[in-house]
């Protein structure tokens, strides 16, 4: 499995934790991955991607693209560090914690989870919380 982490922003990223978060979700959901590309960018790029692919003229925290339909996931996701920073302040969380939550959320989307309904959102939030707790518990060992 290949995990490619790249960024278009100067923000320092906890790359080891990002990689571990991706691996935890895949293992926990019993999924295999061929290649996952994680791109950490700013609002300008994610807004452009939203306009081109979803007809949304505003930035979002993440956008995920599954690139295949096979068993082993090939996909990419983009996360706006600008939006993550604003959300972290709004939710009274650290930037790193919110970044890892959105990373987990993005991987769940690649696996096929949706968040269109209240029930779907609740399921994804529950999974995000579980994987975040597992990630931080793993760091304490």
Curated annotation (Swiss-Prot):
GO biological process, one term: rRNA processing
Major localization class: cytoplasm
Note on cofactor: Binds 1 zinc ion.
PROSITE patterns: UPF0054 (PS01306)
Enzyme class: hydrolase
Gene Ontology CC entries for this record: cytoplasm
UniProt subcellular location: Cytoplasm
Claim: Metal-binding is one of the keywords in the record: yes
Keyword S-adenosyl-L-methionine: no
Cofactors required: Zn(2+)
GO terms, molecular function: metalloendopeptidase activity; RNA endonuclease activity; zinc ion binding
The protein's Enzyme Commission number: 3.1.-.-
Keyword tags: Cytoplasm, Endonuclease, Hydrolase, Metal-binding, Nuclease, Ribosome biogenesis, rRNA processing, Zinc
SUPFAM superfamilies membership: Metalloproteases ('zincins'), catalytic domain
UniProt: Zn(2+) binding residues: 105, 109, 115
Function of the molecule: Single strand-specific metallo-endoribonuclease involved in late-stage 70S ribosome quality control and in maturation of the 3' terminus of the 16S rRNA.
Family: Belongs to the endoribonuclease YbeY family.
The protein's name in its UniProt record: Endoribonuclease YbeY
Species whose genome carries this gene: Chloroherpeton thalassium (strain ATCC 35110 / GB-78)
Gene: ybeY
């Amino acid at each position: 499995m290949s995990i490619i982490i790249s960024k278009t922003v100067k923000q320092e990223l906890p790359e080891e934790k990002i990689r571990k978060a991706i691996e935890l979700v895949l293992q926990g959901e019993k999924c295999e991955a061929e290649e996952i590309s994680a791109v950490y960018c700013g609002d300008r790029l994610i807004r452009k991607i939203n306009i081109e692919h979803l007809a949304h003229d505003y930035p979002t925290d993440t956008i995920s693209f599954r690139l295949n339909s096979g068993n082993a996931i090939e996909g990419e996701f983009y996360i706006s560090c600008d939006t993550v920073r604003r959300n972290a302040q709004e939710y009274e969380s650290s930037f790193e914690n919110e970044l890892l939550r959105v990373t987990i959320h993005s991987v769940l989307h690649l696996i096929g989870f949706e968040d269109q309904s209240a029930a779907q959102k609740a399921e994804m939030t529950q999974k995000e919380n579980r994987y975040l707790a597992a990630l931080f518990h793993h760091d304490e060992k």
